[in-house]
Amino acid sequence: MHYFRRNCIFFLIVILYGTNSSPSTQNVTSREVVSSVQLSEEESTFYLCPPPVGSTVIRLEPPRKCPEPRKATEWGEGIAILFKENISPYKFKVTLYYKNIIQTTTWTGTTYRQITNRYTDRTPVSIEEITDLIDGKGRCSSKARYLRNNVYVEAFDRDAGEKQVLLKPSKFNTPESRAWHTTNETYTVWGSPWIYRTGTSVNCIVEEMDARSVFPYSYFAMANGDIANISPFYGLSPPEAAAEPMGYPQDNFKQLDSYFSMDLDKRRKASLPVKRNFLITSHFTVGWDWAPKTTRVCSMTKWKEVTEMLRATVNGRYRFMARELSATFISNTTEFDPNRIILGQCIKREAEAAIEQIFRTKYNDSHVKVGHVQYFLALGGFIVAYQPVLSKSLAHMYLRELMRDNRTDEMLDLVNNKHAIYKKNATSLSRLRRDIRNAPNRKITLDDTTAIKSTSSVQFAMLQFLYDHIQTHINDMFSRIATAWCELQNRELVLWHEGIKINPSATASATLGRRVAAKMLGDVAAVSSCTAIDAESVTLQNSMRVITSTNTCYSRPLVLFSYGENQGNIQGQLGENNELLPTLEAVEPCSANHRRYFLFGSGYALFENYNFVKMVDAADIQIASTFVELNLTLLEDREILPLSVYTKEELRDVGVLDYAEVARRNQLHELKFYDINKVIEVDTNYAFMNGLAELFNGMGQVGQAIGKVVVGAAGAIVSTISGVSAFMSNPFGALAIGLIIIAGLVAAFLAYRYVNKLKSNPMKALYPMTTEVLKAQATRELHGEESDDLERTSIDERKLEEAREMIKYMALVSAEERHEKKLRRKRRGTTAVLSDHLAKMRIKNSNPKYDKLPTTYSDSEDDAV
């Protein structure tokens, strides 16, 4: 009864929860509520496993034979010299001869000077002048003769005659670059005003500088930027020198044997003769000492000296590993002949000398050389000169074995180093003999016109070294792991035999890699494949109790699932790992305080007292791991060092022109050969007076006398004009002149206004105060106002009338004068003048004479005032 009440309460709680949670879930059963916790089809898959009947049986594999661990690669030791392509240019000294011609056209004004044109050109110096004057006397001619526009033209320094000028050092000489020249001034002629003049300057310049040429040495460039299209090794003899390229007519080239050049600083001839080349171009002549090509240049150059080089054979190719460089170089096993490289004559000489030096300082007491120096062409265009070495203790062991076997010839070969013994396996001497006998005699040959090109970076070699290091470590590690794994599997096979007896289905599923059901049939197991069931067709039931019994319960939860299409629901039990059991055989006696977790999909279904409680997330359950960690040995630390094939200096020096040096020389050219800080003051007035004096001096004594007068007057005029010009050029003088002009304009404007005022109203202009008083009095009288007694008594009527008469006569006199002036201008003869005079007399007699006013006033007048 207690069990029944508890189930009823559980069902009521589930139904009430479903009713309150959603109004649309009314009238649902408890089975449907439990079904709502089922999985979607994406979350998990269930399997239906039929019972095995023995149609398919399996057995466990017997133990395997485990492989042996991998043997490490054996390396031989030796000394190696690495060669790379020589990209540096061939440098040599040249002497440049040329004459710098500057023609300057000037224009002289009255107060200024201008350079209207400046023409500059370089002309070559003849070979005869070089041999006779420059290297013979340390001098150079002031005359320049050159070809322009198919015509020979001549130029003379300072427009004077030809002369031999001493060569003097320039102001900026260095041990690498020296120069000499004949003058440091640019000749400039300033003529008289309004005249063009032209002056010519010829500066003979000798420059000693560096020149460069790169492979294939068909031309060379000089430090100043000039380029000569001729090989520096060209010559008339020997025949190989005459075969060098030359891009000029043969007449422009000359080679002199036993030539003694002069040191222009010490003024002494050289003590040793040389074979001297001279080349004439359109703008310069260049000379240099000839030398054989094979003794001066080499297409390869020494890059690195490796004191400890390891060599091994991997996949039919040599691996040269240099730990100190962190690089590995790969080559064929056939030797390479460096004599076949064009201009590669230096490889053997430098390699043998460097190897001998390293062996003498480091290996002489502990090792012996084995065979001769071997040469190999490595990937990337590098030559590896390799000298195998062998420790003395190991060599003594070989000698004792040879002496014991009475093999005298081989012993002598080893002692005399006639064979290159390479120790691939040091376990037996027969292997060494076989290596010597089977060593290939073929050598790689190149065409005579072939040159080796080296890469500019050895990152590939460093990566190869890193790869070989990692490959060796990983391969050894995997070899040991494979052996240990095989042995572990053989030992665990016993556990598998025992496990399949305890749980055949789980063991068979683990070994076959798929879900199967199994049972033991003696020494073999019968299996049957499981079928996947969709998660949507699987429903978990809420009770694990057997309905027909009160004390029997199911040990696994009950489920309903459907299998296939148009199939009804099948009731079964939930097995392990989402396995569906189509039977109800898993039962147990009911126990108190029952609590179980069963895997259902990706989560766990919790049952308490054989009733479903809730779904528990798998993440909420702690994991007990059975995985055994594999602790492997880590790689040892290996630093990748930066390694450059070519340095910055080599890359910067790869071209024939150093543009920084060319730009620097061009900027210093004027400073080296011309004094640009010297200032020459030119007086154009003196030139003008000197020209006039020379003109009159050519006319004899009379001309000289006239010239003195004219030159004196002209000098005064020029001095006056120069003074005025100097005053005007002064800013204060110009300001004063401007102020004076402005003041004059203002004064002229005021005078013009006064004259116009005098013409229009003379009395107002002459007597402004009197006219103002009279105007005011007339205004008051016009308006009927009476003046004060003072004003009325201050004016004498008689005097006023006399003043009026005086003004009238003054006007008549002025009119008469104007009339006379007009008559004289018209020049009409004496009749007009006489008639005018008679008119004056009539006017004069008709009017009373003007009486002068008394100077004193009478008493009556004073009383009136």
From Swiss-Prot:
Cell compartment(s), UniProt: Virion membrane; Host cell membrane; Host endosome membrane; Host Golgi apparatus membrane
Motif Internalization motif: positions: 850-853
Keywords: Disulfide bond, Glycoprotein, Host cell membrane, Host endosome, Host Golgi apparatus, Host membrane, Host-virus interaction, Membrane, Signal, Transmembrane, Transmembrane helix, Viral attachment to host cell, Viral envelope protein, Virion, Virus entry into host cell
Renumbered residue ranges of the record's region Hydrophobic membrane proximal region: 676-729, 683-729
Virion surface compartment residues: 22-731
Gene3D superfamilies: 1.20.5.1890, 2.30.29.100, 2.30.30.1230, 6.10.250.3280
Modification comment: A proteolytic cleavage by host furin generates two subunits that remain linked by disulfide bonds.
Annotated segments matching region Involved in fusion and/or binding to host membrane: 106-112, 191-198
Domain of life according to the entry: Viruses
GO BP annotations listed: symbiont entry into host cell; virion attachment to host cell
GO cellular component: host cell endosome membrane; host cell Golgi membrane; host cell plasma membrane; membrane; viral envelope; virion membrane
Site (Cleavage): 434-435
Disulfide partners: 49-530, 66-486, 140-204, 298-346, 553-590
Motif (Golgi targeting): 809-812
InterPro entries in alphabetical order: Glycoprot_B_PH1, Glycoprot_B_PH2, Glycoprot_B_PH2_sf, Glycoprotein_B_ecto_C, Herpes_Glycoprot_B
Pfam families: Glycoprot_B_PH1 (PF17416), Glycoprot_B_PH2 (PF17417), Glycoprotein_B (PF00606)
Bilayer-crossing regions: 732-752
Cleavable signal peptide: 1-21
Glycosylation sites: 27, 184, 332, 364, 406, 425, 631
Residues in compartment: Intravirion: 753-865
SUPFAM superfamilies: Viral glycoprotein ectodomain-like (SSF161008)
Function: Envelope glycoprotein that forms spikes at the surface of virion envelope. Essential for the initial attachment to heparan sulfate moieties of the host cell surface proteoglycans. Involved in fusion of viral and cellular membranes leading to virus entry into the host cell. Following initial binding to its host receptors, membrane fusion is mediated by the fusion machinery composed at least of gB and the heterodimer gH/gL. May be involved in the fusion between the virion envelope and the outer nuclear membrane during virion egress.
Family label: Belongs to the herpesviridae glycoprotein B family.
Name of the featured protein: Envelope glycoprotein B
Originating organism: Gallid herpesvirus 2 (strain RB-1b) (GaHV-2)
